[in-house]
Amino acid sequence: MRRPKLPRPRLPRTRAGQRRLVQALMAGCVLGLLPATWMYLVTGDRLRTTADVPRTDVAVVFGAGLWAGEPSPYLAHRLDAAAELYREGRVRVVLVTGDNSRKDYDEPDAMRTYLTRHGVPGSRIVSDYAGFDTWDSCVRAKKIFGVDEAVLISQGFHIRRAVALCQEAGVTSYGVGVDAKHDATWYYGGAREIFAAGKAALDAVFEPDPRFLGPRETGVANALAAER
């Protein structure tokens, strides 16, 4: 059985049609670059290293997946940076935010366990079990945990989006982008950010509620007060 031939797309033949096509392509490129431009403008000089980030009460570590119940290598790098900042006295409390939507998947508890193994007291760690994406984590840090200022910790390809969204959510933020091996996961993460930037811009404009908001929690305030 012969397959029917599908018509091939044809380029405009007239000069006016070609001009409109070029204009449409240029407009698409400009619109595609707007979210990334917005992120760069918002973050400005707010990206630092573990050595020069300002002293801040709270560090926020975003989840990045578990392997057999343990933090993935990328998440472990983030947690190592948080532990380093705590040991050096640059942060006082670590807020770990991640996915706990299933009984068999608990990012925050795995992050807590890793941090305690690396010298951060459990009393200095606060868990957010509903950080399902970056925007949710930022909004919940502000509205649920009362965080007004924070150091955000993530990989370099994600940190600008995290800082931009937390700034929009009302959390004055500095970002520490940890080093990562340029493997397939790194390249995937970088490519994913191209599309995630568009969603981030929409989140910043429309400010949707997180998937789960819930009542106010005093974990961060209690941890800071107990230290004094």
Language-model segments: which ranges?
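Structural motif marking the loop-to-transmembrane transition
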Residues: R13-V22, D183, Y187, A191-I194
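A transmembrane-helix-recognition feature enriched in membrane-embedded lipid enzymes
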Residues: G190-F212
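A structural signal for short, hydrophobic/glycine-enriched beta-strand patches
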Residues: R2, P7, M39-A191
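Short linear elements at protein peripheries
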Residues: P208-R228
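N-terminal type II signal-anchor transmembrane helix
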Residues: P4-T50
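A general structural signal for short secondary-structure boundary/capping elements
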Residues: R102-E107, Y174, A196-D203, G219-A225
